[in-house]
C-alpha cells in the first residue's frame, strides 16, 4: 500500500508517495491547470494499491479531493495545522 500525500497550493500541488515503512518512494510537483488531475492520476497509476492524504481538502485541495472521490479513490483530509 502506498500513501500519496498532497500539499495543495493555489498554483501547484506537491505529491509525495510513501511506502508502508514510511520511506519516500517518489515526489512530484504538479502545476495547477486544466490537465492537473489527469497528469496526477497517470503518475499514480504505478501504485495500484494507494490511498490519498490531502492537506486542507476543504481549501486548496478541495477540487482534487472531490475528483479523487468521484473516481472511487480512498481520500482522507489532513489538517494544515497540528
Q: Model-flagged regions — what are they?
A:
Residues 1-82:
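Phosphate- and other anionic-substrate recognition elements at nucleic-acid/protein interfaces
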Amino acid at each position: 500500500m502506498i500513501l500519496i500525500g498532497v500539499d495543495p497550493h493555489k498554483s501547484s500541488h506537491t505529491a509525495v508517495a510513501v511506502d508502508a515503512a514510511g520511506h519516500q518512494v517518489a515526489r512530484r510537483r504538479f502545476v495547477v491547470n486544466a490537465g492537473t488531475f489527469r497528469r496526477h492520476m497517470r503518475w499514480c497509476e504505478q501504485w495500484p494499491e494507494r490511498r490519498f492524504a490531502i492537506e486542507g481538502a476543504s481549501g486548496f485541495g478541495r477540487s482534487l479531493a472531490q475528483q479523487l472521490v468521484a473516481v472511487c479513490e480512498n481520500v482522507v483530509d489532513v489538517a494544515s495545522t497540528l
